[in-house]
Amino acid sequence: WDWILTQSRKDIVSNINDSKFMAICPFDQNEIELGNYYKETIDWKLNRNKIFDFWGIKNLRNIIKDLNSDDIVHVFTLKSGLLFAFANLFRNNKTKNILTITGLGYLFSDNFKAKILKILLGFFIKRLVNKNFDFLMYQNGEDQKTFNNYSKYNGESFIIPTSGITVKE
């Protein structure tokens, strides 16, 4: 996840001088490079191999508790967004939160377990996404239509250019 912040977001962060950016993500190999672009970097201890990492959510909750109303939280990927929403549960949310869905991923795959998980999480997703995110951004219209319908999202959503990774159809 630190790769996304260094490879596809560093140019944006480098060119906005009137704001300070903090990177909160699990560190892999780009921790030092993150420090070159972000004012502060925080290693979000998360087991990315788990579908639902309770300790990772608790760790994120401890990180975000110190954010204030001036802060904007921009979350990348649907999985990170859902984990953020669970971490933000029962908090008096003071921040403006944006979710960029870079793809629908495992939850919307044809995998049998994913289909069951999607049904089980449906109730929570509908409430948590609407409660936690001021707007959603997508990289394609099909994902926007699919997820907005599934989550019954009632806020604004936008299409943005892709992060530069070419996908063969």
Predicted regions and their residues:
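N-terminal strand-loop element at the rim of the active site
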Residues: D2-D53, D143-T146, I159
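Short His-centered aromatic/hydrophobic patch
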Residues: V75-G81, I101-T102
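Donor nucleotide-sugar binding/catalytic pocket of nucleotide-sugar-dependent glycosyltransferases
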Residues: E40, K126-E169
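Membrane-proximal helix-turn-helix segments that form the acceptor-binding/catalytic region
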Residues: I12-S14, R61, I116-L136
